[in-house]
C-alpha cells in the first residue's frame, strides 16, 4: 500500500500570523508531498516494506536494501517528521502543558521557561537544515536535534514535539530570522496532542 499525504487538520491559513498561509501551502502541498511521492517511488517492488507504518519503516533502516536506503531515510524521514509536525500544531495552541507532561518537563528541565529556552537553543543552533525535538527515551524526556530529515525514531527515541528549521518552513515570512520563527512556534503548539504522545511513549 502506498504512503499518502495526510490532510492538514486545520485550514492552511489557520496558524496565521505565526505561520503564514503561503508557507503552509508550499510546505505541506509541495515539500511534504514530494517526500511521499519519492518514498513511494523508492519502495516500488518492495511490497513488504511499503506495507509497514512509516514509524516502523524509518525505525529499522537496516531492513531496507542498501540501494534504496538513502532515499527511504531522506523521504521516509521527511514524511514521518512532517506528519507529526502538522499534528502538534493548532490554531488553538500555545499556552503551557498541564498534568503529567508539565510535571515531567519541570522535573527534567527545571521549569517550562527553562525547557523553552533549551529547546529554542537546539533549534537555533542546528546548523543548516534539520529539526529540534522533544523526545521520550527510556521513559525520560530529552531535547535533541537531527540533521536533514533524520528522525529520532532512527535512534530508538520517540518524538513527541518537533520544530522544522529547514528554511522552507519559515523563509517566506521570516527570511533569515530563525529565532523569530522559533518564538512564534510556541503560540501554535498543540500541547494536548504532545501530552497524548507523551502518555503513549513513556
Curated annotation (Swiss-Prot):
Single GO molecular function: metal ion binding
InterPro entries: Mn/Fe_SOD, Mn/Fe_SOD_BS, Mn/Fe_SOD_C, Mn/Fe_SOD_N, Mn/Fe_SOD_N_sf, SOD_C_sf
Enzyme Commission no: 1.15.1.1
Keyword entries, A-Z: Manganese, Metal-binding, Oxidoreductase, Phosphoprotein
A Pfam family assignment: Sod_Fe_C
Residues modified to Phosphothreonine: 34, 70
Binding site for Mn(2+): 27, 82, 164, 168
Enzyme category, top tier: oxidoreductase
Cofactors demanded by this protein: Mn(2+)
Co-factor note (free text): Binds 1 Mn(2+) ion per subunit.
UniProt catalytic activity: 2 superoxide + 2 H(+) = H2O2 + O2
GO cellular component: cytoplasm
Subunit annotation: Homodimer.
Functional note: Destroys superoxide anion radicals which are normally produced within the cells and which are toxic to biological systems.
Name of the protein this chain belongs to: Superoxide dismutase [Mn]
Organismal lineage: Bacteria, Bacillati, Bacillota, Bacilli, Bacillales
Gene name of the encoded protein: sodA
Amino acid at each position: 500500500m502506498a504512503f499518502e499525504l495526510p490532510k492538514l487538520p486545520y485550514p492552511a491559513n489557520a496558524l496565521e500570523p505565526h505561520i503564514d498561509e503561503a508557507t503552509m501551502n508550499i510546505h505541506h502541498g509541495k515539500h511534504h508531498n514530494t517526500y511521499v511521492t519519492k518514498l513511494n517511488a523508492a519502495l516500488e517492488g518492495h511490497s513488504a516494506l511499503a506495507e509497514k507504518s512509516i514509524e516502523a519503516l524509518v525505525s529499522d533502516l537496516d531492513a531496507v536494501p542498501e540501494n534504496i536506503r538513502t532515499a527511504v531515510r531522506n523521504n521516509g524521514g521527511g514524511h514521518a517528521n512532517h506528519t507529526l509536525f502538522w499534528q502538534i500544531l493548532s490554531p488553538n495552541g500555545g499556552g503551557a502543558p498541564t498534568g503529567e507532561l508539565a510535571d515531567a518537563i519541570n522535573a527534567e528541565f527545571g521549569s517550562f521557561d527553562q525547557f523553552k529556552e533549551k529547546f529554542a537553543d537546539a533549534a537555533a543552533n542546528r546548523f543548516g537544515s534539520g529539526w529540534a525535538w522533544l523526545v521520550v527515551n527510556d521513559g525520560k524526556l530529552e531535547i535533541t536535534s537531527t540533521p536533514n530529515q533524520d528522525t529520532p525514531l532512527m535512534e530508538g527515541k520517540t518524538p513527541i514535539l518537533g520544530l522544522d528549521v529547514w528554511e522552507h518552513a519559515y523563509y517566506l515570512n521570516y527570511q533569515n530570522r530563525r529565532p523569530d520563527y522559533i518564538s512564534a512556534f510556541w503560540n501554535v503548539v498543540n500541547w494536548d496532542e504532545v501530552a497524548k504522545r507523551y502518555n503513549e511513549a513513556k
